[in-house]
């Protein structure tokens, strides 16, 4: 058993996970919580190199299984190099995407076999799952509109996908929510950022047993 607490942030494109995390960090630090924030794909040098390959807008011919295996490879390296040591040190680790993204994007979105994805996730993580997953839910059209309106956000290959894929991804997340409601908590990401941050803070503090 790890000593720390692992939280993953999940959601469709444009749900605002990163903005919420940026707002939460000073609140957690004020509480004296030792926290590590990181992202998938990426987080470490090898992972970031793989991220570049996955998200390069010019890589339009990437096969779905190739995409999945690249994510899994990045996940493994990230885990052993950064996440596990932080958990062993007793830190709160907050990951911007983790195992559920593979199920939602490559499983539901790309139509790959869910059982195969579950096996690969198990293989890459040695069975590690988040203690808590915060799922930021938003209508697909609204999320993509946010991306289009944000000139500072770098457009990646997944942003260029058709509406159909993104709708399947959201359905994948909602399916995971039904299946693992004890781990995954749904947060309405369509609300103003301040409200989303407050809700997220309350859910996180409750999950960690921290005083609000």
UniProtKB/Swiss-Prot annotation:
GO cellular component, one term: cytosol
Sequence similarity: Belongs to the thymidylate kinase family.
InterPro entries on file: P-loop_NTPase, Thymidylate_kin-like_dom, Thymidylate_kin_CS, Thymidylate_kinase
ATP-binding recorded as keyword: yes
Amino-acid positions noted as binding ATP in the UniProt annotation, renumbered to this chain: 11-18
Pfam families named in the record: Thymidylate_kin
UniProt keyword terms in alphabetical order: ATP-binding, Kinase, Nucleotide biosynthesis, Nucleotide-binding, Transferase
Listed name of the protein: Thymidylate kinase
Function description: Phosphorylation of dTMP to form dTDP in both de novo and salvage pathways of dTTP synthesis.
Gene3D superfamilies from the UniProt entry: P-loop containing nucleotide triphosphate hydrolases
EC class of the enzyme, as a word: transferase
């Amino acid at each position: 058993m790890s000593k720390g607490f692992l939280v993953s942030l999940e959601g469709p494109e444009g749900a605002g996970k990163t903005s919420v995390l940026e707002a939460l960090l000073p609140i957690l630090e004020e509480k004296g919580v030792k926290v590590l924030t990181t992202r998938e794909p990426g987080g470490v040098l090898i992972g970031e190199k793989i991220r570049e390959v996955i998200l390069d807008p010019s890589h339009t011919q990437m096969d779905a299984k190739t995409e999945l295996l690249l994510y899994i490879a990045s996940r493994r390296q990230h885990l052993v190099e950064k996440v596990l040591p932080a958990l062993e040190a007793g830190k709160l680790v907050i990951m911007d995407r983790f195992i559920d993204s593979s199920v939602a994007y490559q499983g539901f979105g790309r139509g790959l076999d869910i059982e195969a994805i579950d096996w690969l996730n198990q293989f890459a993580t040695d069975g590690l799952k988040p203690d808590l997953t915060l799922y930021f839910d938003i209508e697909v059209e609204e999320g993509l509109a946010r991306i289009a309106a944000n000139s500072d956000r770098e457009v990646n290959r997944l942003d260029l996908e058709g509406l159909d894929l993104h709708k399947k991804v959201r359905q994948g997340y909602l399916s995971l929510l039904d299946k693992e409601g004890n781990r995954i908590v749904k947060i309405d990401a369509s609300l103003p950022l301040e409200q989303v941050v407050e809700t997220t803070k309350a859910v996180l503090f409750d999950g960690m047993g921290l005083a609000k």
